[in-house]
């Protein structure tokens, strides 16, 4: 963050509530200003960098009472499963569905923040597109996004992700290379029926919802496609492996998923993703499948 925030950041990281209080009292704009680098606000920094701090709720309350913006930090809570601060933000008026576009619930599903997803649903978050319904395994709602002829209704939504569109990316706090990579990936997407279906299919796989995945396959989802909407761009098998869903992995392989496809970010197979996440048994299972298919 910008230099003006550095003493407050140090106080947050030291879990020093009194020091943060003194700094904000001396300069209330610390709570309301936006940084041009790294975390956009001090409250968002607290959400992400002080998740295990004993005084995190008191520090968050201090910033909220000083006028901090709430919706961005709520999405940050969704990205890291920070339920405790999220409850405070929601109680303080944060919009459970966000300020439009990408919602906190979508953020929670993208990052596999399961407690946050439950909290947001309990607080009234809406399941307003195909991606969310697939990620939650809501087969009853998935069918409602299709017309009788199999086409998608407008309510199915378009592909989206945490980093917004090109204008948001270009004005973000990422460095030049980070902005370039995100912009290139965003520009490669298509928002036709097939692409939206494939995106939703990966959400079903990443959360282990076999019934939802089957419904989407029945509607034409492509099992081995790497869809738009992801920075670490992989197949449904990659994401099932990352999140440790053995039954989903077996389902996908039984339905013809390739274990040899490499993701577009770091060039790993699903076995590599399982290894990265510490799922040793799944890694070994997938490695054996790779050997059998070589």
Task: Cite the ranges covered by each PLM segment.
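Extended amphipathic secondary-structure runs
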Residues: 194-222, 226-229, 245
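Extended, hydrophobic interaction surfaces within ordered domains
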Residues: 80, 87-120
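Ankyrin repeat domain, specifically the short helix-to-loop turn at the C-terminus of the second helix
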Residues: 24-30, 58-69, 87-95, 118-125, ...
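Leucine-rich solenoid repeat scaffolds
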Residues: 106-121, 260-294
């Amino acid at each position: 963050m910008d230099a003006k925030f550095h003493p407050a950041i140090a106080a947050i990281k030291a879990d020093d509530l009194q020091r943060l209080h003194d700094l904000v009292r001396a300069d209330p704009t610390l709570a309301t200003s936006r940084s041009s680098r790294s975390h956009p606000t001090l409250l968002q920094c607290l959400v992400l960098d002080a998740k295990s701090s004993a005084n995190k709720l008191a520090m968050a309350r201090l910033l909220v009472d000083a006028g901090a913006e709430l919706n961005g930090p709520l999405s940050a809570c969704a990205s890291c499963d920070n339920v405790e601060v999220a409850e405070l933000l929601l109680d303080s008026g944060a919009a459970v569905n966000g300020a439009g576009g990408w919602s906190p619930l979508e953020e929670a599903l993208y990052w596999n923040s399961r407690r946050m997803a439950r909290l947001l649903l309990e607080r009234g978050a809406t399941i307003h597109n195909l991606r969310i319904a697939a990620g939650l395994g809501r087969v009853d709602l998935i069918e409602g996004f299709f017309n009788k002829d199999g086409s998608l209704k407008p309510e199915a939504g378009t592909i989206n992700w945490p980093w917004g569109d090109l204008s948001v990316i270009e004005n973000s706090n990422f460095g030049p290379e980070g902005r370039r990579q995100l912009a290139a990936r965003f520009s490669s997407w298509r928002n036709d029926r097939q692409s939206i279906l494939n995106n939703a299919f990966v959400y079903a796989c990443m959360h282990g919802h076999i019934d939802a995945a089957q419904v989407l396959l029945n509607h034409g989802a492509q099992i081995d496609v790497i869809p738009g909407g992801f920075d670490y761009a992989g197949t449904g098998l990659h994401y099932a492996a990352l999140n440790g869903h053995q039954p989903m992995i077996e389902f996908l392989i039984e339905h013809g998923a390739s274990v040899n496809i490499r993701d577009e970010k770091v060039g790993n197979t699903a076995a590599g993703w399982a290894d990265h996440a510490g799922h040793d048994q799944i890694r070994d299972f997938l490695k054996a499948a790779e050997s059998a298919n070589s």
